Amino acid sequence: MFAFVEQRYPTLWPYIQLMRLDRPIGTLLLLWPTLWAVWIAGAGTPSLTVIVVFFLGVVIMRAAGCVINDFADRNFDGDVERTQGRPLATGALSAKQALALFGGLGLLAFGLVLFLNELTFWLSFGGLGLAVLYPFTKRFTFMPQLFLGAAFSWAIPMAFAAETGEVPEIAWLLYVANVLWTVAYDTEYAMCDREDDLKLGIKSTAILFGDADRLMIAILQALTLLALIMVGHRLGFSWPWYAGLVGMSLSFAFQHSLIRYRERWPSFHAFLNNHWAGACVFIGLYFQYF
């Protein structure tokens, strides 16, 4: 599909690249926990409106997040092997064009949230703020992954607000679980760029953890599973939910086989594998309510 766009509409291609529409992994990593929240908040039968709005919102806000991230990193991406081909780094698009695209995506997201209730509307501003803040945190903290986790998890309280009109305690427990998971998988992602980031003075948990990176990832993944077990216990879930968590744990084990030598591309594939971890949890959740 995207090869056709690149050949037929070459002027659109840099915008697609900037929004990462050709690389859906980020959308999937944002989508799975959003669906967890939507399904739990709706007790297995969420509103179709909520499903559609949050699905489209995930696609739009992930695209917007990529745009503002590349805008923030435009002076660094050309010096990092993995990001040298990004449109702002190559000059295919200007900073002004990126900001205009970000504004347009923000307006689309704003239009979507108008279909939901007032509490969800006000919560959406928190999500926007976190999305804008995250890319710039790499300049002043070794924990930008924590800010990414906060941003990537914000759809969880929003989903509960949209379905139930409130944000109960269980929503925040699910939020914490997803923040922990996000920090774990984005540390794997940061391992790919560690050498380049050290040269450029860019901060990350991969640099902060140093030789303890694999241990810290394992601890974060274990805490993720513990938090999700607590979610299941509080909701009275049975074997389908826990079977999904077994699937997630097997995915985590496979990832550790990939990152054992801390090589760039195996670490990237470990990051990609998290899509299956999130999918396992949702499949278990779906059959829990089936």
Curated annotation (Swiss-Prot):
Task: Reply yes or no: does the keyword Repressor apply.
Answer: no
Its function?
Catalyzes the prenylation of para-hydroxybenzoate (PHB) with an all-trans polyprenyl group. Mediates the second step in the final reaction sequence of ubiquinone-8 (UQ-8) biosynthesis, which is the condensation of the polyisoprenoid side chain with PHB, generating the first membrane-bound Q intermediate 3-octaprenyl-4-hydroxybenzoate.
Q: Which domain of life is it from?
A: Bacteria
Naturally occurring in which organism (per UniProt): Alcanivorax borkumensis (strain ATCC 700651 / DSM 11573 / NCIMB 13689 / SK2)
Does this UniProt record's set of keywords contain Transmembrane helix?
Answer: yes
Q: What class of enzyme is it?
A: transferase
The compartments listed are: Cell inner membrane
Disulfide partners: none
NCBIfam families assigned to the protein according to its UniProt record, in alphabetical order = ubiA_proteo
Which cofactors does it use?
A: Mg(2+)
Describe the reaction catalysed, as an equation: all-trans-octaprenyl diphosphate + 4-hydroxybenzoate = 4-hydroxy-3-(all-trans-octaprenyl)benzoate + diphosphate
Task: Tell me what topology the record assigns in the membrane.
Answer: Multi-pass membrane protein
Q: What is this protein called?
A: 4-hydroxybenzoate octaprenyltransferase
Question: Which segments cross the bilayer?
Answer: 40-60, 99-119, 120-140, 142-162, 165-185, 215-235, 239-259, 267-287
Involved pathway(s): Cofactor biosynthesis; ubiquinone biosynthesis
Q: Tell me, what's a Pfam family for it?
A: UbiA
Family indicated by similarity: Belongs to the UbiA prenyltransferase family.
- What InterPro entries does the record tag this protein with? HB_polyprenyltransferase-like, Prenyltransferase, UbiA_prenyltransferase, UbiA_prenylTrfase_CS, UbiA_sf
